[in-house]
Amino acid sequence: MKLSVKNLSKTYKNGVKALDGVNLEIGVGMFGLLGPNGAGKSSLMRTIATIQSPDAGEVFFNDINVLKDNISLRKILGYLPQTFGVYSKMTADSLLNYFAVLKGVSNKKERVELIKKLLEITNLEDARWKNVSGFSGGMKQRFGIAQLLINNPKLIIVDEPTAGLDPAERQRFLNVLREVGSNSTVIFSTHIVDDVKELCNNMAIMNNGRILKQIKPEDSTKELKGKIWTKIVEKADIESLNNKLNILSTSFNPD
C-alpha cells in the first residue's frame, strides 16, 4: 500500500496559502506529520480525506485516483478529525451500531460481535452502556478510533488526536493507535514531537504549507545535536545576543 501526494496546492478565499506544492510518499505503518499550528496539516488531511478540493495537484492511494474517485477512497478510509460531534443521549454501543449500519454491516449478529471487538481494542468495554457525550476527552478520542475501524480501513487519518489530553489519557490513546496501525497506512498529525518519536516509523516536518523534510524520527534531531543549548543570561544582554545568535525562545525568571 502506498499513498502518493503530488504538487498539492490550496489557497483559501481569504488569501491564505494553506498548501504550497506538497509532495509525499507514505507506505504501510505510522507516518507522523509534525508542524506548528497553522502549518497546513489539517488542510492536507482534509484534502486527502476528500473533504475539500485542492486548487492543483494529485493524490493516489494504490490505484485509486483520490481526487477523481472519492467514493472508492471513502470505502477504505478511516478519518478522525480534531473535533467531532456525538448524539447526546446515545450510548457507545448504540452509536457504534448506528455507524455500523451506515457503513453497510447489515447483519445484526455481525454488528454485535464487531462492536464488542472494537470496544475491546479501544479499552472501552466498561463504558459500553454509557452515553458518549459524558466521556472524557481521551475516551472520546478512543471512541473515534473505534468508529473509524468499523469498515476495516486501509488508510487511516487522525488529526491532532492528543491535543488537550492529560498524560495518562494520551498514553492510552497512543497505545490504541499503535495497535491498529500495523497493517494500514496511518497518517498522524501533531505539533508534539514526543508523539511522533514514540509512535511513528517515518515522518515529515511541515510549515507554511510546505513539506520541509521527510525523514525517520530517530534521525530528525541528529542534525541539531550539539547546536542547541540553554543558557542563563542577564536581561540586559538579550538584545546583543539576539544580534549574534539564532535564539529560538526566551523566558523570564523573576528570581
What are these regions (language model features)?
Residues 172-255:
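ABC transporter nucleotide-binding domain
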Residues 131-135:
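Conserved ABC ATPase signature
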Residues 57-68, 72-73:
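Conserved ABC transporter NBD signature motif
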Residues 156-159:
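Catalytic Walker B motif of ABC-type/P-loop ATPase nucleotide-binding domains
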Residues 36-40:
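Walker A (P-loop) phosphate-binding loop of ABC-type ATPase nucleotide-binding domains
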Residues 97, 101, 109-127:
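Conserved ABC ATPase "signature" region
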